Amino acid sequence: MELLLPHPSNSTPLTVLGFLDRAASVYGDCPSILHTANTVHTWSETHNRCLRIASALTSSSIGIKQGQVVSVVGPNVPSVYELQFAVPMSGAILNNINPRLDAHALSVLLRHSESRLVFVDHRSISLVLEAVSLFTQHEKPHLVLLDDDQENDSSSASDFLDTYEEIMERGNSRFKWIRPQTEWQPMVLNYTSGTTSSPKGVVLSHRAIFMLTVSSLLDWSVPNRPVYLWTLPMFHANGWGYTWGTAAVGATNICTRRVDAPTIYNLIDKHNVTHMCAAPMVLNMLINYPLSTPLKNPVQVMTSGAPPPATIISRAESLGFNVSHSYGLTETSGPVVSCAWKPKWDHLDPLERARLKSRQGVRTLGFTEVDVRDRKTGKSVKHDGVSVGEIVFRGSSVMLGYYKDPQGTAACMREDGWFYSGDIGVIHKDGYLEIKDRSKDVIICGGENISSAEIETVLYTNPVVKEAAVVAKPDKMWGETPCAFVSLKCDNNGDGSVPVTEREIREFCKTKLPKYMVPRKVIFQEELPKTSTGKIQKFLLRQMAKTLS
């Protein structure tokens, strides 16, 4: 058997781009994208439009070459969805960028990525023009205007050589899209959200994206023809892979610019939404909406990011949201760990079920291995739910590396064959992983390691608390002490007439936490600072805490 070797017939590179060809064949007449009353596409139309854009990018008039970077600055609108396929189909590397960045940060990413072309949503025109004004004429990328649901022509649009629909008209729907020569070929360049440090460029291969996407569909048991609501930004880890996954199952993609409670509830009711992904912030927003009522039909929700407190999951499920929890990083292409549900948990009380769901879980089907290693010895910690260590990964969807940063790559992709996440966690007796904190979020008070996430979980059980984040505050005697930042619900204690005090919050924590874990300081804010994907920006809170010392 040793003479049986790989052959071109059995070793074609894995890529998600073929999902669109199949969707056009199997689900051609089915709706692919719904946005406004005037934007309804079928999978055949979406396939046709993506091929036209890919063809236009490679034309002599635009001249994008294989391996060059093409950036997209826009929200969850149809053109941005199409570009998730069209850009890599042209042989270029897809680079989604957060449209809520400021001009300086955007210019840094465009320069670092060496982007040759930028697709720009019409509401981000001034932002992008300010960013590229910092470039020399030779450095400036080609700009193409995305005009989804644009009502009025903008005077700034004259700075754009092309519009999306114009270059599509020039494209060829019979274009033979450019398949990767190897599945290890880069497909996307994503920048980390920068909640703890400067953003890093994460390069992901066709293989990584394929394995992540298929695993996500299997792990969530996504059926054929679901109705998927885009509340998760497509620019955030490519919408965790569902930008391509929805094509694999012939889903109807419901696109929306606005992500607020009234809009979400309205779209769920109007389109009979079955699935959506949401950061814990969005769940928190939905459960605190004063006019919320139980859903007519259950909606499957996948959440990821900061560990959602059990109370938020429990309240969401009481409204009809069936919450699943996953965990991953930009560097792992998206979620690679999920809280796989066990039938024996069905009979537990709602809060206990929610507590189990708030754990991160076990590796997804397409991933190889997840472990928790002692940071001093490098050995696996005991599976006792108590022994903490750093969470490490290895599997097909781990990044190729950080773009132009070999030192940063070597620091986390180490010679022992593991990717080191920087997250702190435990493994329970049943083998399920639970994050305790980011390594930078652990508070060392008098030599004791304190998990900020544990304190936050307690704070969320207080009925007046809407948002909570705990960081280290420098202390001359103890080194560091816990400092809590809290925002309150609008109705406060019921009628809003009685203010909540710092002492009351601390006394509440004393009933549920050891004394050394009780926040020494509580700061009230109307809203905690967040990234556009809902992550609380703890580095800003740390800076505030330092000024209190």
Curated annotation (Swiss-Prot):
InterPro entries: AMP-bd_C, AMP-bd_C_sf, AMP-binding_CS, AMP-dep_synth/lig_dom, ANL_N_sf
Tissue spec: Expressed at low levels in roots.
CDD domains: ttLC_FACS_AEE21_like
PROSITE patterns per UniProt: AMP_BINDING (PS00455)
Enzyme Commission number: 6.2.1.-
Keywords for this protein: Fatty acid metabolism, Ligase, Lipid metabolism
PANTHER family associated with the record: ACYL-ACTIVATING ENZYME, ACYL-ACTIVATING ENZYME 10-RELATED
Role this protein plays: May act as an acid--thiol ligase that activates carboxylic acids by forming acyl-CoAs.
Protein's recorded name: Probable acyl-activating enzyme 10
Gene: AEE10
